[in-house]
Amino acid sequence: MKHALLVFTKVPKAGEVKTRLTEDRGGILTPEEANGFYESCVLDVIDTCLTVEGVDVWVCYNKDGNRADLDGLLQGVKGSEKIVGVFPDAGGSFDDCMQYATDYILKNGAEDRLADAVTILGGDLPSLQRKTIEEAISKLDRLSKLSATGAALVQGACQEGGFSLVGLTTSTPFDFHKVFYNMDGITALDMLVNKVVEENIPFGTVEMMPDVDIPVDLASILPLLRALEAAQKNDPSVTVPRRTMEKFKEIGLETFAFPPHRDEIG
């Protein structure tokens, strides 16, 4: 089975990415700092994807994004020549954009499809591990053999009932309609699972990967990245997002936990 990895991202631009991390939206970063963080994170994610063997790596960016700026940014990726293709989404809701990107690669199973399975990742996953991607691909291969049609779907959850990774085969009866935007108050992950159960799709999960959208996410991810850095000294299979960590140091971000009040102990 031919696999594609698709990094789904906005073109980084100050004031347009990670705005909920900025002071104007109640956050702690300037627009330039938030943009610098996102740039670093996207490059780290793509770097990690490019270390996975036997897959094609694609990048899908927002329709209104500046392609020249993105091309310039991608020159900073080690092995950028390995990126098979870069294309814009078609606009619309996030559901629409995800569906367009999926169809662009899988082409509804047509002979001119670009892959037999696609795994989509966000650009804001600082703790992304190569072994997590490899596990998702392996599970897609295994699960697809459980169905006469080759259908299979794998997801990796993130905070607040969302997911940060989703992979599916070209014959999987799944679409993103109402997954991220619905009027019923159903979380994205719940909606995904509802569709999987309804269609009886062979289904698997990989480890949770937090994204970074709001200040509390920063407070959570910083200790995790330090833990990854320490773990890599004894386990070279651990992926450390060097650019993102350097950016955090440049900004001067540190975590702090208030000690509990005495009457809250015991």
Short names for language-model regions:
Residues 187-266:
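Conserved alpha/beta core of the MobA/IspD/sugar-nucleotide pyrophosphorylase nucleotidyltransferase superfamily
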